[in-house]
Amino acid sequence: MQDTERKEAALPTSIFLIGMMASGKSTIGKILARTLGWPFFDVDREIEKRSGVAISTIFELEGEAGFRARETQMMAELTAKPGAVVAMGGGAPMFDINRTLLKRGFVIELRSSVSDILERTRRDTTRPLLQTEDRARRIRELLLERGPVYTSVADAFVVTSRANPERVVERILAMPEVAAIRARVDAGQRGEPA
């Protein structure tokens, strides 16, 4: 993100996690939020709660376009909450409107290797984009497509491959930008949890 864009926007008071599926966004997000004493939101889980059905069912019934519309609507709501940690869906940053919404917070990309993602998802049958015979190839394709977008959107990144989630959170908390966000929130700029 360009410095001039950040200067024009209000200083962030929330942390948004982006990255590939199974990169650790939910696990690390929960630990980070608990450590900060902030609410944690996972965009996909919030969509499931509101709709009453699994993401895979939404993909089946409404297609990817229907899911993406729900995702953008949920992101618009969650990115407006100050003092929150929000885990975004892996494909969310691929859309202009969602990239604009991400400018409301400090964006951290969680990076993981193909082999780690493959290992973490090997028994997972709920991810619509991995319902293919060659999962490793599909993950590589998604990384090639999404990686440059993640990098362009992120304010910072952390490698999560083979890393202990608590250590990853320690690295995030050590970022000067995160310390500044924490100070702003502690000074009273936090909203109410949902």
Go through the PLM ranges and name each one.
Residues 84, 106, 155-156:
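Well-ordered beta-strand positions
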